[in-house]
């Protein structure tokens, strides 16, 4: 019999829709135990606002994990710094959010949890609380002391990884170095094999410039950097197609023969994916020593506590994490 696993969940910004989505997740059965790293009153108050049943069970790390029954969650308590009003940010709770992320991350690193799923955070309020914070990806990279991580977003039909993430456009060309591409492609290839169960990953690689540089007439990064790296990695046996112009890569004749796309920067690859599957997408951090998935949307403060938040992306993120757990066992 396969051992039941524990998955830890962080709701994210307490004034946003994260707690709503957690309560909605609890309304169905799950084959894993859902351990929510959060404030108890926050969850029970939000459940009452939504008119949904919720029983919180204490987290018992020394007891065997049990599949989650509908209407329940396992609670790993972290106490709010300030009381929460749905839809209204409180700066001090930026500390609370980071505490939940740190505890969940540490639990994955010490083997308590098989995967981590994160709800949406408000980066601005965390920084306003005096905590430098760029995003989940960078936070987990630093805390886990990972050498390098890669952001990938996915729907059921498409996976897009990023060579660079939250950089100003003016800095991207300088950031695309041979060392970076070697690292990113190696991590992408490795995790597609080990976490997604793809024996021989096929990766499409975008060029950096319009028309992938047009033979050097619209930029030379393809000739100077991208093509040499791809040739070296092909010699190692990787199946890489590119560099291809990003404006024509996202069509069936290419995508039907690929397992993932590597875009050179954030707004090159993600608009297509989000147009195709917004609300159904999942953010995955590759290169971490544990499985981490996340929703692909923000805090939606205006919807908090109103029963109008769509739980679809959270369900997809949890289901994908469960599949990845199975692939790594």
Curated annotation (Swiss-Prot):
Cellular component, GO annotation: cytoplasm
A Pfam family: PdxA
Gene3D superfamilies, per database record: Isopropylmalate Dehydrogenase (3.40.718.10)
Top-tier EC class: oxidoreductase
GO molecular function, one term: NAD binding
Superkingdom of origin organism: Bacteria
Stated family: Belongs to the PdxA family.
InterPro entries: PdxA, PdxA_fam
Protein name stated in the entry: 4-hydroxythreonine-4-phosphate dehydrogenase
Cofactor: Zn(2+); Mg(2+); Co(2+)
Note, other: The active site is located at the dimer interface.
SUPFAM superfamilies for this protein: Isocitrate/Isopropylmalate dehydrogenase-like
Compartment list: Cytoplasm
Keywords: Cobalt, Cytoplasm, Magnesium, Metal-binding, NAD, NADP, Oxidoreductase, Pyridoxine biosynthesis, Zinc
Its job: Catalyzes the NAD(P)-dependent oxidation of 4-(phosphooxy)-L-threonine (HTP) into 2-amino-3-oxo-4-(phosphooxy)butyric acid which spontaneously decarboxylates to form 3-amino-2-oxopropyl phosphate (AHAP).
Enzyme Commission designation: 1.1.1.262
Reaction equations catalysed: 4-(phosphooxy)-L-threonine + NAD(+) = 3-amino-2-oxopropyl phosphate + CO2 + NADH
First-listed, main subcellular location of the protein, grouped into a coarse class: cytoplasm
Subunit note: Homodimer.
UniProt pathway annotation: Cofactor biosynthesis; pyridoxine 5'-phosphate biosynthesis; pyridoxine 5'-phosphate from D-erythrose 4-phosphate: step 4/5
Entry binding sites for a divalent metal cation: 166, 211, 266
Swiss-Prot/TrEMBL GO biological process terms: pyridoxal phosphate biosynthetic process; pyridoxine biosynthetic process
Cofactor binding notes: Binds 1 divalent metal cation per subunit. Can use ions such as Zn(2+), Mg(2+) or Co(2+).
Organism: Escherichia coli O81 (strain ED1a)
Residues reported in the UniProt entry to bind substrate: 136-137, 274, 283, 292
């Amino acid at each position: 019999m396969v051992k039941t696993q524990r998955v830890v969940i962080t709701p994210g910004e307490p004034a946003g829709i994260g707690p709503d989505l957690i309560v909605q997740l609890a309304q169905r059965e799950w084959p894993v135990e859902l351990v929510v790293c959060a404030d108890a009153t926050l969850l029970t108050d939000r459940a009452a606002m939504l008119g949904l049943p919720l029983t919180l069970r204490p987290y018992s790390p020394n007891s065997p994990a049990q599949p989650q029954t509908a209407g329940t969650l396992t609670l790993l308590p972290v106490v709010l710094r300030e009381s929460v009003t749905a839809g209204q940010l409180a700066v001090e709770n930026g500390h609370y959010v980071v505490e939940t992320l740190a505890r969940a991350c540490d639990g994955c690193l010490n083997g308590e949890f098989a995967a981590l799923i994160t709800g949406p955070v408000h980066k601005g309020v965390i920084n306003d609380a005096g905590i430098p914070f760029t995003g989940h990806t960078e936070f987990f990279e630093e805390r886990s002391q990972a050498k390098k991580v890669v952001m990938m977003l996915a729907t059921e039909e498409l996976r897009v990884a990023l060579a660079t993430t939250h950089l100003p456009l003016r800095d991207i060309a300088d950031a695309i170095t041979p060392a970076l591409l070697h690292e990113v492609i190696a991590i992408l290839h490795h995790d597609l094999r080990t976490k997604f169960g793809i024996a021989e990953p096929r990766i499409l690689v975008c060029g950096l410039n319009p028309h992938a540089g047009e033979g050097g007439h619209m930029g030379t990064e393809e000739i100077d950097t991208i093509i040499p790296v791809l040739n070296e990695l092909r010699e190692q046996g990787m199946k890489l197609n590119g560099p291809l112009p990003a404006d024509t890569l996202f069509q069936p004749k290419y995508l039907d023969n690929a397992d993932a796309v590597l875009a050179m920067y954030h707004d090159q690859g993600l608009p297509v994916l989000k147009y195709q599957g917004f609300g159904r997408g999942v953010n995955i951090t590759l290169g971490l020593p544990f499985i981490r998935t996340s929703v692909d949307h923000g805090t939606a403060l205006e919807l908090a506590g109103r029963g109008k938040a769509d739980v679809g992306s959270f369900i997809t993120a949890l289901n994908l994490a469960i599949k990845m757990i199975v692939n790594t066992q």
